Amino acid sequence: MNIDRNRVIRCFAAYVRNFDRSDAGIVLKYQHSIRVSRIIEKLAHGISLSDADTDLAWCIGVLHDIGRFEQLREYHTFIDYRSVDHARYGAHYLFDEGHIRDFLSDASEDSLIRLAVEQHNVFRLPDGLTPRQKQFCQLIRDADKIDIFRVYVTQLAGTNNIWHTDLSRLKTQSVSESVMAQARRMRTIRTEDKKTRMDFYVGVLCLYFELAYPVSRQLADEQGYYDTLLQFHSQNQQTE
């Protein structure tokens, strides 16, 4: 498959211009998408994918969160269970509405791209995937997790962030029992179980447990954001 990267980026930037670029959440998701595309490219090289498959992985990285922009404009939140499943909406926008052709002329990998976009946020990948399908789904899920570590570190370092909270407030919050129980099992946390901001913080820490590839853990370690998250100390005795 032939992917024109300049066209993909140009069309993605044009799409994002339809939204309020003074909104910090829109800026965040645009930057996140670009960073995830770079991360997934590194992961693809790390597992020795072909040049064509590396380009395909990169493209999935750019497009994986395209549903976030309309979600934020319509619902003013990034929490799917309070609004819309952003991954499914992104797949709908790209494929049911036909906008994938804005980005790519070649339709030969449409089904794989749709699957990877649609499944990048699920709690567990479905059974029955082919090895190739599973590989691309795991790559985008790993790349997404790795950049989420950066997002949390950089957002919490600022006084004006998309969660309207800061470290001083976070340090006093408790962790819900169900979230702590899942964390002790070293598993990812179901979003609907998260009640406090500290629950979400613990949920981010637990993403590391399910990185699929050794190169993913290596890259997360090298970037240092995950280690920064681990340095957090709570003023809430139960949480600490």
Spans of model-derived segments:
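Catalytic-loop motifs flanking and including active-site residues across diverse enzymes
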Residues: 32, 55-58, 86, 90, ...
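Acidic/histidine metal-binding catalytic segments
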Residues: 48-59, 100-118, 132-139
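Divalent metal-dependent phosphate-bond-processing catalytic cores, especially two-metal-ion Mg2+/Mn2+ enzymes
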Residues: 2-3, 25-34, 38, 42-50, ...
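Post-HEXXH active-site segment of zinc metalloproteases
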Residues: 73-88, 158-162
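An active-site-proximal "capping" alpha-helix that borders the catalytic cofactor pocket
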Residues: 35-43, 84-99
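Active-site flanking loop/helix segments enriched in acidic
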Residues: 9-35, 67-80
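His-Asp-centered metal-binding catalytic motifs of divalent-metal-dependent phosphohydrolases/nucleases
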Residues: 54-79, 90, 112-123
